[in-house]
Structure formats: C-alpha cells, structure tokens
Amino acid sequence: MRKEIFRGAGVAIITPFTETGVNYNELGRIIEDQIAGGTDAIVITGTTGESATMTDAEHREAIRYTVEKVGGRIPVVAGTGSNETSYAIELSQYAEKVGADALLLVTPYYNKCTQNGLVAHYTKIADSVGIPAILYNVPSRTGVGIKTETYAKLSQHPRIVGVKEASGDLTAILRLRAATGDDFAVYSGNDDQIVPILSLGGSGVISVLSNVAPRAAHDICQHYFDADVRTAAKMQIDYADLIDALFCEVNPIPVKTAMRRLGYDAGPLRMPLSEMEPVHAAQLDAALRKHGLLK
C-alpha cells in the first residue's frame, strides 16, 4: 500500500517577510486562502519559502505557527533538511514535537557527499523521528543527486515514504519508480511535469504554481486521478505560460512578485535574491492577466 502523505497538489508556500522578521498575520491569510482554494497540503520552509535565509528561530516558529493555523485540516509538511546532519535532526525532531505530519529533506548541499553519505544522512534523520519523511532531489541547486540504487536502499526505511523529484529527468524518475516499487510516493517538484510524473505513477506535485492558482494545480491532479487524462493534459498545457513566467527568474523571485501583484503583503525578498527585471515582470503580469488572476 502506498505511503502517501497527501495525494494531489501541495503548495510550496512562500514566507511573507517584514524588514525584521516573518509576517505571521499574512502567512495565516495565505494559508487560509490556500485551504479554501483546494490545496491538498501545506509545505512550509522549503526553497520557495526562502528557508536558506531564515534564522533558526524563524524556521522553527514558521513550522509551529503553520501547524497551529492549519489545525489538522490538511497535512503540513515541514522542510527540515540541512547540509549538517545533526542540525537536520534537531529541526526534524522539533517539527515532530509541534505536530507536523511529515518532513521534507533536501539533499545536503555544497558539501556534495557520496551516495553512501546520502544513505547514512537520511537514515540517521529517519531513525531519529517517528513521523514520515519525503526526500527532496534537486541537484541543480544542491550539487548532488540521488541515484537509482540509493533510492532503492532508502525506500526500505519504514519512515522514508517518498520523494519530491525536481531533477527534471523523467528517465531517471522512471528508473526510481521501478527500483522502489509502488508504495514509494513520487511528487513532481516541477510544475511543468505534473502530468508526466502522474503518468509514471506519481502521487502529485509540490507546487509553486499553487501559490497563485491553487485550484488549477489541484484540478490538474484530480482530473488525472479521475481518469480524465485529456483534461489534465489540457490544463497542463494551458498553464504552461504561467508556469514559465513563474520560473523566468530563479524561484522564488517571480512567485513572490506575483503574490504581491495579487494583493498579498508578501514583503521583501531576502538578499542575495533581488527584484525582477522589468522585462520578466511584464511577462509575469501578462500571464497572470491571461488566467484571470490579475485585473
């Protein structure tokens, strides 16, 4: 039986900042709008949430606040990965303590450990907690990717239940599906590959698009699950321009800009991220207007 934390579209939610910290009132508003819009899970303190720029206190409080605000209505997945195993364990144990449903564990970045190192790292974290963990494979950012044989080993751990796959390599994803079996959940980490990964037996997407169009991301998945593949594929194609615009500069610059355009007090990007180039901002606005999100 597949060990899914959620099925469908989980939002890789932004973190609204002030000049001095996290804007929790606005985060709460965004969470409520996401739930009302059909999001299937909240994924907090990930790449899109600018977790790399958050202090330890901010990281912990964002997780605690989100769990409290969601109140069990949908799953909360907490990003607790680190390139220091001991710190990842501390964050993961904290997330479990405050009630997160699952962990999202990015591969250790910068140090570029071996595949044996990945197995040891993830096993030690999973052994330290009692809640499930989703691996996060994004080699374009971290400098290390999870190989097929490593997936096969890690999938045997009872608390390592799936992966957010953002490598973009569908052939590698096909191989990981074959190596891990049907009970290992695969979530697309790329909004332009929702339907392709669902076609390989995927469980859904951890989505940037969901920030601005939660119903669309949910519906793409739901149509596929309902065996209406034609409609799911049509929606994937129809939203390609908005997805392209949300990634025309490095994530989360465009999506945070988009959230401001939609009336959210998303606050500043934290340095070294910078504001969008005007030509890309115009592309983003055009896509938002086309889909009726911006007047």
Predicted regions located by residue number:
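Catalytic cores of TIM-barrel enzymes
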Residues: 2-5, 175, 184, 259
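Alpha-helical structural signal in soluble globular domains
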Residues: 37, 61, 65-70, 94, ...
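C-terminal alpha-helical cap/extension of soluble enzyme domains
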Residues: 8-16, 37-39, 199-202, 206-295
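Glycine-rich phosphate-binding "P-loop"
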Residues: 137, 159-160, 270-271
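Catalytic alpha/beta core domains of metabolic enzymes, predominantly
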Residues: 127, 141-247
